[in-house]
């Protein structure tokens, strides 16, 4: 089971974006499962990697549709799958306009034809439903007939259907249709210099992070509130990585600049090779209850790919 908190503040409430819950603003929780002949979920932990199912569920429903108002529609996306990453697109080729990521709004909307969504990652998109008829969001190619037959005899990692959601516009187009704002937030300005660089390798054949499995009695990293660090994350196999209690910016992915849709504040990132993060420690932890950083692939975290982070309060000036 998975749920979603929608956290608003004065900035988000003032944004000229759809905000009528259930009319033009919808939470979308995506999961892959494996169901038996009676529709009951089956789970067999893999020896390596993470669990991959063959049935796509959205808000607990297979191949759902929703009636939406004509105009802009806002979808708040969450990948709540154990390990599967999705590449989302619209069936008629119209763009997805990305407006927010894990921890807040992007500086400006980013129009994309395809949008990746890693386990644990959150994104917000808006879609123009003012013209045309219904449109579907899909997540890649569905299993062919031979794949489906093979799936009757052995577990399959190929999705039976890649239909995420169908949007069906209803009603009349408003007399006035707002355009998307050109800007959402001012550009991110780094206040302060990087005080330290750390490197972490997420293993699988050798479980753990940097060859060490999680130990609740051990602190793996210490930092000070209000400082910046450079974290370089390597992965032996593609997986998502999450850090609690921080906000970070993706500086580069395998040596290339981050995609425009990944330039907002984040706490979860897909690692396929190496990524470089600029990590800002904005929250104080407790020595008794440290923050965690870990593989967002559920089974890999269970096998020990996690570490503990203590963030100490900034010194007071007296």
Where are these predicted regions, by residue range?
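Low-complexity, flexible helical/coil segments
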Residues: 20-28, 44, 111-115, 277, ...
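Active-site pocket scaffolds in enzymes
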Residues: 98-110, 197-318
